[in-house]
């Protein structure tokens, strides 16, 4: 069901609580981290538009695929192996908590600024 743009995090969390995966073939932006924060693995195409968020996806917390045939196979796998993707969602949440909280990103920016200032 297409519901349009949702900016309210409570409503968004309700949708994520019912989702097994989040599939976004053409975009891998902030939705990657939002999905991971909600224990939902993110699935996208290798050439998706991204601001770098796609680099957070690895085989234990999401899937990056190459072709429409890969996506078809992936959807079949999701249907046949639900527990695999539930585990992947837990891994996504753990990754988010350990590496991608806003505090982690702020510290990375501070470290980058400090590095440049030392040069």
Descriptions of predicted regions:
Residues 1-6, 59:
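Nucleotide-activated donor-binding/catalytic signature segment of Leloir-type glycosyltransferases, i.e.
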Residues 6-10, 29, 68, 78:
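Structural motif corresponding to alpha-helix initiation and N-cap regions
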Residues 9-13, 30-33, 48-56:
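Short glycine/proline-enriched, acidic/aromatic patches that form the donor-sugar handling elements
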Residues 14-27, 40-41:
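Acidic donor-binding loop of glycosyltransferase active sites
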Residues 41-49:
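Short hydrophobic beta-strand element within catalytic cores of glycosyltransferases
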Residues 82-114:
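A charged, aromatic-enriched C-terminal amphipathic alpha-helix characteristic of glycosyltransferases
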